[in-house]
Amino acid sequence: MSVADFNIEYHGKDFIDEIERRAAVAIEVAGMKAEGYAKLELENPPRRIDTGRLRNSITHTTEDKPGEHTAIISTNVEYAGYVHEGTVRMAPNRFLKNAIDRNKAEYKAIIESFLDH
């Protein structure tokens, strides 16, 4: 075998870049799903929708760093904490926590589907 017959190819960086890209897309899709589920959770007892302001304020963002991708589901409505955690006179409606906890298997499946290709 001569040197001309021997070829080594390195695809490490390209492979890692592709995995990072897929992970970022997967987290974006999972974040959109979680945002939707959080809005739906407000319909569950104890239901507290008057104007829809809280529901309409729920959004998601993502943070992407090498090897670390995060979806953040949040609201900027000042009374959201009282609805979520409850008060002395009002039972909690943990719409954010429930949106995450009740759908973990779906989020996992979304992420796996993007990374398995």
Give the residues covered by each predicted segment.
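Short, Lys/Arg-rich flexible segments
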Residues: 1-117
